[in-house]
Amino acid sequence: MSGVSNKTVSINGWYGMPIHLLREEGDFAQFMILTINELKIAIHGYLRNTPWYNMLKDYLFVIFCYKLISNFFYLLKVYGPVRLAVRTYEHSSRRLFRWLLDSPFLRGTVEKEVTKVKQSIEDELIRSDSQLMNFPQLPSNGIPQDDVIEELNKLNDLIPHTQWKEGKVSGAVYHGGDDLIHLQTIAYEKYCVANQLHPDVFPAVRKMESEVVSMVLRMFNAPSDTGCGTTTSGGTESLLLACLSAKMYALHHRGITEPEIIAPVTAHAGFDKAAYYFGMKLRHVELDPTTYQVDLGKVKKFINKNTILLVGSAPNFPHGIADDIEGLGKIAQKYKLPLHVDSCLGSFIVSFMEKAGYKNLPLLDFRVPGVTSISCDTHKYGFAPKGSSVIMYRNSDLRMHQYYVNPAWTGGLYGSPTLAGSRPGAIVVGCWATMVNMGENGYIESCQEIVGAAMKFKKYIQENIPDLNIMGNPRYSVISFSSKTLNIHELSDRLSKKGWHFNALQKPVALHMAFTRLSAHVVDEICDILRTTVQELKSESNSKPSPDGTSALYGVAGSVKTAGVADKLIVGFLDALYKLGPGEDTATK
């Protein structure tokens, strides 16, 4: 063969030689040289002979195929072939049924049924009385203060609240004591015109806000030299800011433009809202079926180059279970990722459990290496006025990335620490007054009462109501339960008709009770009413669930065949919040 020596191969000499002859020679190195050379020639010919617009089209097609294939293998790694096939089937089925229900053939029938349910929602939600005045528009002349106060009293009496004062509601009102409400009222009156946007005008509000943040940081064992945070309007804003900070930090430090969050399926819907608002992808991780904690092995599988934040709950809202924060912390450190702990619900319960005498507790705060941010609602078990929460960070660099700064605005130098511009100073003043009034001992006592009641309720179900199954091993203030023998949502409806309101859950179907200072005092009544209602439901096993109750609504939400209908019902509920009366729209008046 010309051009070939014992040690050297001439590429030109090999070009054109049949591949099968090369294989006969058995020289793999020479075969690879030929292959690479032919590839180079092919690429050169493509670049020389292909118009630029076709080249661009081909490039985009290759990128599309690459992303499609890489995403497929990513999901295959995360879920495995069987689970991925099931998820694909469920997703496709939902899309198909959503399309069918929105088709011209079925749209009219579906809308008719949806309208009926919307009407029942409005009838339940919109309440008034003939003795009340109505104000669809401003009165021509202002109403005297005494008359306004009288109307407020009428509204309170004629459109009564649910019996929250009697402890018959899960969560919602966490303290409710008259003395504390009186203190908060005085605080609000003194600072009702204060705005946190103007610290120069209201310097005392700035002082109190900084002290609220400092007190909460110490409760969660933040580093004394670097720990920091801000107050917010509630748990959802705290979660939004934690996600925003993680997104902007990853953008500036890692150049990530397609950010992803990894969170348990039980993480608060505020994380879904953050992903929706800020253009991020939320990867939901399934739970360990025994502990109901997030599956750490699956968390690792979800991590990729776009991951910007890991999430754990302490505890979660649905089941009252705290995720393995220490395990998540190790993963966060290994992959150099931020870890947010959502303790909005746990708040002043989990932070005082040790001092309240509870033993063998997992670490859930900044003592866990890897935890970079924590959210805590002061308006839950901190008993502050509604609209009060704190977002905490391990250091100021993380906090800085939640700020908005604009030095070029024509209205002057502009900056805001949270999502809102104006913020009601009276709320944070009420929070400050509540915290300093309660003191550490007051919160320890509340923790003992509330957790003690929750554990009593849990034990009662385990020992006296065999038809109910406690989910996981809740150790805090929330106890959830399911059933293999009863229609749980029908149980919820029956309890509601008796004046006792539990929270309805789904995936799996369950109920929970979030104990408060109010419900802790009536835990024996709660146990008794639950047991008797379960017995009634069992004795009427052939009865049908209410057609317009919780069973029907959650049945619609959970069925593949009614995909999209639940969305319309939720929108109907939200629309009803702003209607003057059933069938009336605020905008038409």
UniProtKB/Swiss-Prot annotation:
Reported cofactor(s): pyridoxal 5'-phosphate
Pathway participation: Lipid metabolism; sphingolipid metabolism
UniProt superkingdom: Eukaryota
Transcription regulation in keyword set: no
Membrane topology: Single-pass type I membrane protein
Record's GO cellular component terms: cortical endoplasmic reticulum; endoplasmic reticulum; endoplasmic reticulum membrane; perinuclear endoplasmic reticulum; peroxisome
Disulfide bonds: none
InterPro entries xref list: GrpII_AminoAcid_Decarb (IPR050477), PyrdxlP-dep_de-COase (IPR002129), PyrdxlP-dep_Trfase (IPR015424), PyrdxlP-dep_Trfase_major (IPR015421), PyrdxlP-dep_Trfase_small (IPR015422)
Result after altering residue 174 to F: Mildly decreased enzyme activity
GO MF, one example: sphinganine-1-phosphate aldolase activity
PTM statement from Swiss-Prot or TrEMBL: Glycosylated.
Reaction(s) catalysed by this chain's protein: sphinganine 1-phosphate = hexadecanal + phosphoethanolamine; (4R)-hydroxysphinganine 1-phosphate = (2R)-hydroxyhexadecanal + phosphoethanolamine
Enzyme Commission number(s) of this protein: 4.1.2.-, 4.1.2.27
KO phenotype (gene knockout): Leads to the accumulation of endogenous phosphorylated sphingoid bases, and exhibits unregulated proliferation upon approach to stationary phase. Causes a reduction in total C15 and C17 phosphatidylcholine levels.
Regions annotated as coiled coil: none
CDD domains named among the record's database cross-references: DOPA_deC_like
Consequence of substituting residue 172 to P: Loss of enzyme activity
One Pfam family named in its UniProt record: Pyridoxal_deC
Effect recorded for residue 67 to L: Reduces catalytic activity
Residues bearing PTM N6-(pyridoxal phosphate)lysine: 380
Listed Gene3D superfamilies: 6.10.140.2150, Aspartate Aminotransferase, domain 1, Type I PLP-dependent aspartate aminotransferase-like (Major domain)
Function (record text): Sphingosine-1-phosphate lyase that cleaves phosphorylated sphingoid bases (PSBs), such as sphingosine-1-phosphate, into fatty aldehydes and phosphoethanolamine. Regulates intracellular levels of sphingolipid long-chain base phosphates (LCBPs). Plays a role in the regulation of global responses to nutrient deprivation in yeast.
Protein family per UniProt: Belongs to the group II decarboxylase family. Sphingosine-1-phosphate lyase subfamily.
Miscellaneous remark of the record: Present with 13100 molecules/cell in log phase SD medium.
Full protein name: Sphingosine-1-phosphate lyase
Gene source species: Saccharomyces cerevisiae (strain ATCC 204508 / S288c) (Baker's yeast)
